[in-house]
């Protein structure tokens, strides 16, 4: 049980909380959507629960030319997807967009949670995992802010972007994230299903479809009789 629950409005408040708690040795537990299956959001030693969902969930910038969106880490998955689907109305965009990331916890998880757990989803075969979508991250840490570079590709390494992703709060509190987004083309969606005589044939067909250089399905499932 936390000693206090804080609901930040902006990045500056988070920075002050992190600095204060670091100085006074107070543990911080960042709460996004609460969908963790590893019990990582439980305040096992008291301290501060930093709840990002209620107020820290805004769009910071939308860039249609580069097809990117920058949001606060507390934004929920459904909120992000609806925002992108309504881009024409909200941002005066030329078309609708999608985030392309739909983990099993989509309805309850936050964008920040996707990044710090290095998540995957049912559409990752086509769009990639979350690390393939992240361009830039901003973190509040006890020693100051960490901002990764916003470039889609770099020749230098190690990649700070990839080091920070999957860290689950070990290096700081993720505040802002810039993601690639994708054009929403519902007219191109087709659904198919096939039945095979046995599991071995199904596996072979699946392997061939993934390796034949004919493009990837957005959602691809191979299931046995059970």
Region spans (language model):
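Short proline/glycine- and acidic-rich turn/helix-capping motifs at secondary-structure junctions
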Residues: 37, 222-226
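A structural preference for short, hydrophobic beta-strand core positions in alpha/beta folds
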Residues: 30, 219-222
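FAD-binding subdomain of flavoenzyme oxidoreductases
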Residues: 58-220
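Glycine-rich N-terminal segment of FAD-binding domains in flavoprotein oxidoreductases
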Residues: 1-55
């Amino acid at each position: 049980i936390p000693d206090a629950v804080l609901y930040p409005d902006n990045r500056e408040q988070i920075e002050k909380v992190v600095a204060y708690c670091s100085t006074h040795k107070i543990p911080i537990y960042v709460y996004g959507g609460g969908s963790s299956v590893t019990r990582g959001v439980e305040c096992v030693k008291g301290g501060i629960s930093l709840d990002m969902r209620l107020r820290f969930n805004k769009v910071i910038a939308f860039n249609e030319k580069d097809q990117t969106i920058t949001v606060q880490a507390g934004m929920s998955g459904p909120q992000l997807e609806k925002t992108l689907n309504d881009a024409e109305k909200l941002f005066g965009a030329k078309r609708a967009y999608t985030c392309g990331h739909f983990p099993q916890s989509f309805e309850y998880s936050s964008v920040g949670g996707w990044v710090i757990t290095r998540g995957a989803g049912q559409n990752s075969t086509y769009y990639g995992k979350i690390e393939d979508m992240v361009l830039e991250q901003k973190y509040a840490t006890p020693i100051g802010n960490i901002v990764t570079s916003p470039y889609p590709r770099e020749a230098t390494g190690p990649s700070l972007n990839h080091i920070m992703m999957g860290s689950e709060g070990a290096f700081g509190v993720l505040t802002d994230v810039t993601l690639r987004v994708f054009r929403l083309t519902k007219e191109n969606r087709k659904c198919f299903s096939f039945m095979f005589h046995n599991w071995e044939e199904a596996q072979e067909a699946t392997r061939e479809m993934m390796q034949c250089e004919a493009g990837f399905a957005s959602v691809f499932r191979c299931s046995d009789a059970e």
